[in-house]
């Protein structure tokens, strides 16, 4: 039974628990979900303890902008991150007056008529909810602090063989 469980978890589906508010309002603290393991192929990180049995990825499909993806970083092989894919290799990402800009295209953002309160660490914060539409047409909800500061950033170019992710909760 243990071997079957390891095979299922390594190759097919894996359960995850949402520990933080970074993906609110899409995923809430305490949510539990199953993630398919085969969507983007397999790498050494697909297996328990990340043994170096595979170099690179096999049976891989390319992720699409807007996909919610579970991943590990090269610097931290133990922590699973769950974020939304915003930029592909070579894309330019920037925030201008609080608006997300990808490859010089302002990401369309429309206000959802409700006001929300979400958890940020151990405190609750008031947020405005928006629906964003990415350049490929995918839509999702995001939240920003109710009195957000209209942040600006430098242009970031996504390096080759890398991706750019953001949580749907943009200010916490």
Task: Kindly give the residue locations of the regions a language model identified.
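Alpha-helical transmembrane signal-anchor/signal-peptide segments
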Residues: 13-31
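Hydrophobic membrane-insertion alpha-helices, especially the h-region
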Residues: 1-11
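Soluble "head" domains of membrane/secretory-pathway proteins
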Residues: 25-172
